[in-house]
Amino acid sequence: YKDAVTRMLANVASAGFDASQPLLAKHGAEKNVLFVLVASDRGLAGGFNIGPQRYVEHEMERLAEQGINSSVITCGRKPTEYFTFRKVKPAMSFVGISSEPNMDEADRIASFVMEGYAQGAYDRVVLCYWHAKNRVEQTQVTEQLLPITKEQLTMPNKPRTPEALSKIEGHEYTDFAFDPSPEEVLGQLLPAYFRTVIFHALLDSAAAEH
């Protein structure tokens, strides 16, 4: 589903990429960074919780040295306890959902983040979670959530021309006629795309946990 939404956005963005959209707009000088950390409710072996927790903690310390404020949303009992113990109060925290995430939590996170970014409370938003590569291997993923870049709305490492898109396996390019304009359609699709990215991270982390 996430891939399908991304392909749809690739078609729309190819017709009209409007950098003034709230989720695409850059804020200039970076003053506030928000991390969305997805880990586990359980104390799992290895670095499942420790790896992303320490990464976010070190990044927050590095930003503080540069005079940049930072905060974190914690998804999972362990990261919530980790930062609370270190006197860092999460901007939001979710406990008891790591094994069975649902769209309600994803919507709450996405709405909070999108509203905060649009109002200028955050200048950059970073997502950190585990990707279930296969049954025995997981990969820690760190990616920028906001601002959404032009590259994120295209197929990975591929140009976005109609000719190039038509050659990508599983991607069919159609020369759409937009009503309303592609810029307006893009503005309507971006929030749905953003919610999908959040929910995908919660599901991916749950799969990696198991």
Residue ranges and their predicted role:
Residues 1-210:
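C-terminal beta-strand-loop-alpha-helix "lid" module of Rossmann-like NAD(P)-dependent dehydrogenases
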